[in-house]
A protein has these predicted regions:
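A structural signal for multi-pass alpha-helical bundles of membrane permease subunits
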Residues: 16-287
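Short, Lys/Arg-rich, polar N-terminal cytosolic tail immediately upstream
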Residues: 1-13
Length: 287
């Protein structure tokens, strides 16, 4: 038996593997079903959406017609909304990742008075619904005259209690104390240690935190709804919502816009999949 072979007694039985595969197939269908339905629906007109099956294409392909209607209804602003969402999500993701890793590293590696209380406050933030904070955030942003600006989305979304929690877990498991102590003995400052050593060790974990913040910012709806009035500053989620409020909207065009709005997220996850998976594993075992 090779060293990497699993002992026969530990191997799952054939029925167990069959049940596992069946469950995974069901979960896969559950996850991909809405995306498939969105692809099919984006090729249909309003009448076809009401008269044909939602799980198969109709005889007429209205994809190009829906795209023209999408551009017409949005007055050419649809791709501007996509770029806005990319801007908000990318900047908030980068800032939020740095803040989360810095805070998590500080909580994991530094002893200071009140550290336990700070961790309790951060964990409490995980239990609080985001929608509950929307109105207080609006009042704060309005008081400092940041409403209807890009910062009204970027700044709140850059603060992530879940990101800080992940940063602490990853820093505690992936940054050895011996390396930090050696750098201090060599005369390195805490800032230099963080930027030259800690960030490199936590690079895979940072990708995971970035993806969580990026997706959360991209999907954020209530905050832009409260703080953004200008059509040129809307993210794609708010822009598509404004389309749905029109009288007799073109649902095929609306669904096509939703499909195009999902593509950047799919590309991002596929492109960063290797780093994301290694980042999830990084916090699983304490080194």
């Amino acid at each position: 038996m090779k060293p990497t072979d699993t002992p026969r007694s530990l191997r799952p039985s054939v029925p167990a593997r069959a049940v596992t595969i069946a469950v995974l197939v069901i979960v896969l269908a559950y996850m991909l079903g809405p995306v498939y339905w969105l692809i099919v629906s984006s090729t249909k007109s309003n009448s076809d959406l009401l008269t044909t099956s939602g799980w198969w294409f109709s005889g007429r392909n209205s994809f190009s017609t829906n795209y023209s209607a999408l551009m017409s209804w949005t007055q050419g602003l649809f791709w501007r909304w996509i770029l806005n969402s990319l801007l908000y999500s990318s900047v908030a993701g980068v800032l939020g990742t740095l803040l989360s890793v810095a805070a998590g590293y500080g909580l994991a590696k530094f002893e200071f008075a009140g550290r336990g209380a700070v961790q309790v406050v951060i964990l409490s933030g995980l239990l609080m619904p985001i929608a509950l904070l929307t109105i207080p955030l609006y009042l704060v942003l309005d008081a400092v005259h940041l409403t209807n600006t890009v910062w009204s989305i970027i700044l709140p979304c850059s603060v992530s209690p879940f990101g800080v929690f992940l940063g602490r877990v990853y820093a505690d498991s992936s940054v050895p104390n011996e390396i930090i102590d050696s750098a201090r003995i060599d005369g390195a400052s805490e800032v230099r240690i963080f930027f030259t050593i800690v960030l490199r060790l936590l690079a895979p974990a940072m990708v995971t935190i970035f993806l969580f913040i990026f997706v959360a910012t991209w999907n954020n709806f209530f905050l832009p709804l409260m703080t953004i009035n200008s059509a040129e500053l809307k993210p794609v989620t708010l822009g598509l919502y404004s389309m749905s409020t029109y009288f007799n909207p073109q649902y095929g065009a609306l669904l096509q816009g939703a499909l195009l709005g999902v593509i950047p997220l799919i590309v991002l996850f596929l492109g960063l999949q290797r780093f994301w998976q290694s980042g999830l594993a990084a916090g699983a075992v304490k080194g």
